[in-house]
């Protein structure tokens, strides 16, 4: 018989990047008594991954649970970046409602639309939390109108349109149901969750069913599958059948060795859990996202949410430069292959395939440049050494044979004086200006529809054009007819002439030709790119050249050579910079840009063809 678990609420916190989801979860954890009063807690405690803490973004969805009065609230903190949208899509299957967090100043942004659309498609209950209302430039009433317009644009039904609004400052630790209410604590949000999010439903006596929505890993117990029990119960030592989501005919009987529920930031061992509980199971070696744990007697799979397809790809390959193998721990094609295919176990948005005709190269497809750059950064930190190519978009073909390309919706916030330059640059990259709105602080918000390939390599140029004051946010919109050719980099490269070590004298002579990426003492090799030429052509320079010494000295002492500090490129900047005939060499200690063909004579012949 179908019953409700009134003692449980399962919710996801969804939002655009940097609208304050993780800070909000921090405050809910603190005010629910999850931490001791004297316990020191890091800011954004849910962002446990090093890259997440450095960049201030959530990449992987996290599970936590709090108890408010007599109700256990399971909370999933999701990512707000479009490149990790696959994380959002699958974890929403575990919950009955969402808290949509929207910045009281920025309002509705591209990812707000994406995450809300996914929640409405699954018919989830929505609570709108307008966060950061303590900002001086906050405009909560206007943001309410923007959100209601978005609901209407997404064809929300009457029940969904009638969702409650909460106003909050997660940083200051309060939430209010009305802007005139006293600002004390988060209790209004707790009450709103308990009163408006439906309790999970299921049949406690039915056959066991649990969809695996995320995979965790622990070196002591191995792979850990996380999901919500839809029906029945799970017990330690229970024998269950795993039904593979790719092929439901593939089934395997396994035994549950450990069963956990969530409490605060910890997993808690439990002997048994019932429908509605979000749990973690271990002891199953080859469990994958999308698989269903079922009773042995009646194995019925739960349909898995289709994940949006990748839009960009890069080639990952063995590093074959003259400096190959000197800095990395894992350098062979087998190492790289195993690591890439292992990533597929936890990242459902990623695709990996071996490039035909080359056993040392792999085509890796993802949802955007950030998606792939985070994978590259993780591999670097783990000791891998490899090379990657420039990102390319993935084209589709319609039924008439027309070429289709991925299109992004871009929201660009820039100081008014730079808006003309940004409009010109994005228009050259086949962007179509959809709207232009003045916002507070002398900024203008530009809304563009632009091909994904038009944004490849643009962010560095954008930061230069806006003197670091611009913000660009994008979200995948769909596929449209090919918009025509785009000319990318307008500059050439300064290329090292020979193998050796860069010296001050050689760099001093080279710096007049353009902007250098390296300083003295760095190892270089022929074909390595050591700087940028402001003109379109590539120039070979000898940065290893030392000054010719004579046994006579000039009457005045040699003037000290002054070098301009080099421009050190970050991983994202380097990926933005490389052209189609170039590669980025990635090692745990260095990023080097190089030509695909290192030999200048062979390169010249290839360019003439």
Describe the residue ranges of each PLM region:
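Long insertion/accessory domains within large nucleic-acid-processing enzymes
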Residues: 262, 267-270, 404, 450, ...
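Helix N-cap motif at beta-to-alpha junctions
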Residues: 233, 285-286, 366-372, 415-419, ...
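Interdomain boundary/hinge elements
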Residues: 41-44, 154-166, 200-211, 240, ...
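A short, contiguous, amphipathic alpha-helix enriched in charged residues
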Residues: 321-344, 560, 564
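Short glycine/threonine-rich beta-strand-turn micro-motifs
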Residues: 169, 356-371
């Amino acid at each position: 018989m179908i019953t409700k678990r009134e003692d449980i609420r399962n919710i996801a916190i969804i939002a655009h990047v940097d609208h304050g989801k993780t800070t909000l979860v921090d405050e809910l954890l603190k005010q629910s008594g999850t931490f001791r009063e004297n316990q020191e807690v890091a800011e954004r405690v849910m962002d446990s991954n090093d890259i997440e803490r450095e960049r201030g973004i959530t990449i992987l969805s996290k599970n936590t649970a709090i108890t408010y009065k007599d109700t256990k609230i399971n909370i999933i903190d999701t990512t707000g970046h479009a490149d990790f949208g696959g994380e959002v899509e699958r974890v929403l299957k575990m919950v009955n409602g969402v808290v949509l967090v929207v910045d009281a100043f920025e309002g509705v942004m591209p990812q707000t639309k994406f995450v809300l659309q996914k929640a409405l498609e699954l018919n989830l209950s929505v609570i709108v939390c307008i966060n950061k209302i303590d900002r001086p430039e906050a405009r909560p009433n206007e943001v309410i109108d923007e959100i209601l317009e978005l609901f209407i644009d997404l064809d929300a039904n009457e029940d969904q349109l009638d969702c409650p609004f909460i106003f909050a400052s997660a940083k200051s630790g309060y939430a209010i149901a009305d802007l005139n209410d006293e600002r004390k604590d988060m209790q209004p949000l707790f009450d709103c969750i308990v009163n408006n999010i439906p309790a999970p439903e299921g049949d406690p006596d039915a056959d066991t069913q649990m969809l695996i929505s995320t995979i965790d890993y622990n070196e002591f117990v191995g792979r850990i599958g996380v999901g919500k029990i839809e029906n029945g119960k799970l017990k330690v030592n229970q024998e269950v059948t795993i039904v593979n989501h790719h092929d439901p005919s593939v089934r395997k009987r396994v035994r549950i060795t450990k069963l956990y529920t969530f409490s605060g930031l910890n997993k808690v061992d439990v002997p048994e859990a019932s429908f509605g509980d979000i749990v973690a199971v271990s002891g199953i070696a080859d469990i994958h996202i999308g698989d269903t744990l079922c009773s042995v007697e009646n194995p019925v799979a739960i349909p898995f949410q289709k994940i949006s397809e990748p839009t960009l790809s890069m080639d990952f390959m063995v590093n074959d430069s003259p400096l190959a193998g000197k800095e990395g721990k894992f350098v062979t094609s087998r190492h790289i292959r195993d690591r890439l295919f292992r990533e597929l176990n936890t990242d459902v948005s990623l695709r990996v395939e071996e490039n035909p005709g080359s056993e040392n190269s792999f085509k890796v497809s993802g949802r955007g440049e950030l998606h792939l750059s985070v994978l590259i950064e993780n591999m670097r930190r783990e000791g891998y050494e490899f090379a990657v190519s420039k990102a390319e978009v993935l084209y589709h073909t319609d039924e008439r044979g027309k070429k289709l390309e991925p299109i992004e919706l871009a929201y660009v916030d820039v100081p008014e004086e730079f808006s003309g330059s940004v409009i010109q640059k994005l228009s050259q990259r086949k962007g179509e200006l959809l709207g232009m709105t003045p916002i507070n602080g002398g900024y203008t918000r530009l809304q563009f529809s632009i091909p994904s390939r038009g944004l490849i390599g643009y962010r560095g140029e954008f930061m230069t054009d806006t003197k670091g004051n611009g913000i660009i946010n994008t979200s995948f919109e769909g596929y449209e007819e090919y918009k025509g050719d785009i000319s990318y980099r307008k500059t050439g490269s300064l290329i090292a002439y020979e193998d050796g070590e860069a010296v001050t004298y050689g760099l001093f002579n080279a710096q007049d030709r353009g902007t250098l990426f390296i300083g003295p003492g760095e190892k270089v090799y022929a074909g390595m790119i050591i700087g940028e030429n402001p003109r379109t052509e590539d120039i070979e320079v000898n940065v290893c050249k030392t000054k010719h010494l004579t046994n006579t000295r000039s009457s005045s002492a040699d003037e000290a050579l002054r070098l301009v500090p080099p421009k050190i490129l970050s991983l994202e900047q380097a990926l933005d910079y490389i052209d189609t005939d170039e590669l980025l060499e990635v090692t745990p200690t260095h990023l080097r840009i190089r030509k695909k063909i290192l030999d200048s004579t062979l390169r010249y012949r290839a360019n003439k063809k």
